[in-house]
Amino acid sequence: MNNSVITVIGKDRVGIVYDVSKILAENRINILNISQQLMDDFFTMIILVDTSKCSKSRQEVLDLFAEESKKLALDIRMQNEEIFQAMHRI
């Protein structure tokens, strides 16, 4: 796995950064850069991560984020960095 971009969107509450960071740490996914912003009651975060030390397959990580999204009432998505950049190129 290469670098990936994780996006997190949800209603603002205490502990979102902790909850997402905990998942990453437990799976040996390193945060390279992080940006977060509040828009009214909505929390948004974009995280650039290095997944090279993660022992899970890309699909297993995607499935984990889908499961955790439901538990945490957040929209957590992960994309390959190159795909993310191509989709957001002007």
From Swiss-Prot:
Q: Which InterPro entries match?
A: ACT-like_dom_sf, ACT_dom, UPF0237/GcvR_regulator, UPF0237_ACT
User: Locate the ACT domain: which residues?
Assistant: 5-83
Under the heading CDD domains, the entry gives: ACT_1ZPV (cd04872)
Family matches, as SUPFAM superfamilies: ACT-like
- Classify the source by domain of life: Bacteria
One Pfam family from the record = ACT_6
Show the PANTHER family listed in the entry: UPF0237 PROTEIN MJ1558
Record family assignment:
Belongs to the UPF0237 family.
- Recorded protein name is UPF0237 protein NMA1909
